[in-house]
Amino acid sequence: MVGEGEAVNRLSGVLLVDDNPLQLRVREAVLRKAGFHVCVATTADSALAMLHALADRVGVVVTDHIMPERSGSELVRAIRAENNWLPIVVLSGLPEAFGEYEGLDVVFRAKPFPPAELIELVRSSLDQAARQRGAA
Protein backbone atom coordinates (compact mmCIF):
# COMPACT_ATOMS: atom_id res chain seq x y z
CA MET A 1 0.00 0.00 0.00
CA VAL A 2 1.14 3.50 -0.75
CA GLY A 3 0.58 5.63 2.31
CA GLU A 4 0.19 9.36 2.70
CA GLY A 5 3.04 11.33 1.23
CA GLU A 6 4.49 8.50 -0.87
CA ALA A 7 4.98 9.48 -4.47
CA VAL A 8 2.86 8.34 -7.37
CA ASN A 9 3.16 9.53 -10.95
CA ARG A 10 1.70 12.94 -11.63
CA LEU A 11 -2.08 12.67 -12.14
CA SER A 12 -1.90 8.96 -12.86
CA GLY A 13 -2.43 7.69 -9.34
CA VAL A 14 -5.55 5.97 -8.10
CA LEU A 15 -6.99 6.87 -4.70
CA LEU A 16 -8.88 3.76 -3.62
CA VAL A 17 -11.36 4.21 -0.74
CA ASP A 18 -13.09 1.36 1.08
CA ASP A 19 -13.68 0.54 4.74
CA ASN A 20 -13.53 -3.21 4.04
CA PRO A 21 -9.86 -4.27 4.36
CA LEU A 22 -10.29 -7.40 2.24
CA GLN A 23 -11.99 -5.55 -0.62
CA LEU A 24 -9.37 -2.82 -0.39
CA ARG A 25 -6.46 -5.28 -0.62
CA VAL A 26 -8.02 -7.20 -3.50
CA ARG A 27 -8.78 -4.08 -5.55
CA GLU A 28 -5.38 -2.60 -4.76
CA ALA A 29 -3.65 -5.79 -5.94
CA VAL A 30 -5.70 -5.86 -9.16
CA LEU A 31 -4.85 -2.24 -9.97
CA ARG A 32 -1.17 -2.57 -9.06
CA LYS A 33 -0.84 -5.69 -11.21
CA ALA A 34 -2.32 -3.67 -14.08
CA GLY A 35 0.44 -1.08 -13.58
CA PHE A 36 -1.40 1.64 -11.70
CA HIS A 37 0.05 3.55 -8.76
CA VAL A 38 -2.41 3.14 -5.90
CA CYS A 39 -2.87 4.88 -2.57
CA VAL A 40 -5.56 3.68 -0.19
CA ALA A 41 -7.84 5.16 2.44
CA THR A 42 -10.30 3.42 4.74
CA THR A 43 -12.53 6.43 5.51
CA ALA A 44 -13.87 9.42 3.64
CA ASP A 45 -11.98 11.77 5.95
CA SER A 46 -8.65 10.03 5.38
CA ALA A 47 -9.37 10.02 1.64
CA LEU A 48 -9.91 13.78 1.67
CA ALA A 49 -6.68 14.29 3.62
CA MET A 50 -4.76 12.13 1.14
CA LEU A 51 -6.35 13.90 -1.80
CA HIS A 52 -5.18 17.24 -0.42
CA ALA A 53 -1.68 15.89 0.24
CA LEU A 54 -1.39 14.21 -3.16
CA ALA A 55 -3.57 16.54 -5.23
CA ASP A 56 -1.09 16.80 -8.09
CA ARG A 57 -0.67 13.02 -8.29
CA VAL A 58 -4.16 11.54 -8.03
CA GLY A 59 -5.85 11.13 -11.39
CA VAL A 60 -8.95 9.20 -10.30
CA VAL A 61 -10.80 8.33 -7.10
CA VAL A 62 -12.45 4.91 -6.74
CA THR A 63 -14.71 4.75 -3.71
CA ASP A 64 -17.16 2.41 -2.07
CA HIS A 65 -20.64 3.77 -1.44
CA ILE A 66 -21.33 2.44 2.05
CA MET A 67 -18.77 3.48 4.64
CA PRO A 68 -19.02 4.43 8.32
CA GLU A 69 -19.10 8.06 9.42
CA ARG A 70 -19.29 9.56 5.89
CA SER A 71 -20.74 7.72 2.91
CA GLY A 72 -19.36 7.60 -0.58
CA SER A 73 -21.88 10.23 -1.67
CA GLU A 74 -20.71 12.56 1.11
CA LEU A 75 -17.11 12.01 0.00
CA VAL A 76 -18.03 12.78 -3.61
CA ARG A 77 -19.85 15.98 -2.60
CA ALA A 78 -16.82 17.10 -0.56
CA ILE A 79 -14.51 16.43 -3.52
CA ARG A 80 -16.85 18.17 -5.97
CA ALA A 81 -16.99 21.25 -3.72
CA GLU A 82 -13.29 21.74 -4.53
CA ASN A 83 -12.71 19.85 -7.75
CA ASN A 84 -15.05 19.42 -10.72
CA TRP A 85 -12.62 17.73 -13.11
CA LEU A 86 -11.33 14.77 -11.06
CA PRO A 87 -12.85 11.49 -12.28
CA ILE A 88 -14.65 9.53 -9.58
CA VAL A 89 -15.80 5.92 -9.79
CA VAL A 90 -18.35 4.79 -7.19
CA LEU A 91 -18.74 1.08 -6.42
CA SER A 92 -21.83 -0.23 -4.67
CA GLY A 93 -23.70 -3.44 -4.03
CA LEU A 94 -26.86 -1.32 -3.94
CA PRO A 95 -27.80 -0.32 -7.50
CA GLU A 96 -30.60 1.86 -6.10
CA ALA A 97 -27.92 4.09 -4.52
CA PHE A 98 -27.19 5.56 -7.97
CA GLY A 99 -29.77 8.28 -7.32
CA GLU A 100 -27.59 9.76 -4.58
CA TYR A 101 -24.98 10.64 -7.22
CA GLU A 102 -27.18 12.33 -9.82
CA GLY A 103 -25.61 15.53 -11.05
CA LEU A 104 -22.24 14.76 -9.43
CA ASP A 105 -20.50 13.53 -12.61
CA VAL A 106 -19.41 10.10 -11.41
CA VAL A 107 -19.19 6.65 -12.94
CA PHE A 108 -21.40 4.36 -10.85
CA ARG A 109 -20.79 0.61 -10.99
CA ALA A 110 -22.88 -1.99 -9.20
CA LYS A 111 -20.94 -4.78 -7.49
CA PRO A 112 -19.95 -7.51 -8.03
CA PHE A 113 -18.02 -7.25 -11.28
CA PRO A 114 -14.89 -8.88 -12.72
CA PRO A 115 -11.44 -7.42 -11.96
CA ALA A 116 -10.91 -6.60 -15.64
CA GLU A 117 -13.86 -4.21 -15.45
CA LEU A 118 -12.26 -2.29 -12.57
CA ILE A 119 -9.09 -1.93 -14.62
CA GLU A 120 -11.07 -0.66 -17.61
CA LEU A 121 -13.07 1.79 -15.46
CA VAL A 122 -9.86 3.27 -14.05
CA ARG A 123 -8.09 3.35 -17.40
CA SER A 124 -10.99 5.03 -19.21
CA SER A 125 -11.43 7.55 -16.37
CA LEU A 126 -7.75 8.50 -16.51
CA ASP A 127 -7.85 8.74 -20.31
CA GLN A 128 -10.92 10.96 -20.21
CA ALA A 129 -9.33 13.26 -17.63
CA ALA A 130 -6.16 13.51 -19.73
CA ARG A 131 -8.21 14.47 -22.81
CA GLN A 132 -10.09 17.11 -20.82
CA ARG A 133 -6.86 18.58 -19.47
CA GLY A 134 -5.41 18.62 -22.99
CA ALA A 135 -8.44 20.47 -24.33
CA ALA A 136 -8.30 23.08 -21.58
Spans of features found by a protein language model:
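Two-component/phosphorelay signaling modules centered on CheY-like receiver
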Residues: 21-39, 106
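Hydrophobic/aromatic residues positioned on beta-strands within the core alpha/beta folds
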Residues: 91-92
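Short hydrophobic/Thr-rich beta-strand motif most characteristic of the beta2 strand and flanking loop
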Residues: 35-43, 50, 87
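Non-catalytic signal-transmission and effector/linker regions of two-component phosphorelay proteins
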Residues: 1-15, 21-28, 52, 56-57, ...
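Acidic catalytic/metal-coordinating carboxylates
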Residues: 42-46, 71-75
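Receiver (REC) domain active-site loop signature in two-component systems and cognate sites
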Residues: 67
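Active-site residues of response regulator receiver
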Residues: 64
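A Lys-centered signature of the CheY-like receiver
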Residues: 111
